[in-house]
Amino acid sequence: MATEAQPAKQAKLLIVEDDVMIRVVLADMLCELGYTVAAEAASIDEALEATRKTDFDLAILDADLEGRSVSPVADALVARDIRFVFITGYGDHGLPAYRDRPTLRKPFQIDALKRTLQERLGTG
């Protein structure tokens, strides 16, 4: 049985996604790629709490959580100098204020996720 190569450092990730099915699939993909899911959040409040209480290396942010912009979470991550990636089903960019940040358009394949994470974590 072939095993996926492990990231140089087993990075810990925060998943911020309001759709439970997408969250589950994303967590499975991350585990398959050798990453650790440090925490999951389904709302802005849960995500902000996770940014304060959880140790992680990178966050994956759904740009739209229950009709609300994920901007407060992105702002908190910038303040703590934590890297993040947007995922969205709406357009090619996560948020206008953060258009320079990587964005994966849903649905995305595991190879695109792997490449994006390696680039952001400097392990590619």
Task: Show the residue positions of the predicted features.
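Acidic, metal-coordinating helix/loop segments flanking the phosphotransfer/catalytic sites
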Residues: 40-58
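Short amphipathic alpha-helix used as the core "switch/output" element in two-component signaling
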Residues: 68-82
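Conserved acidic carboxylate
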Residues: 17
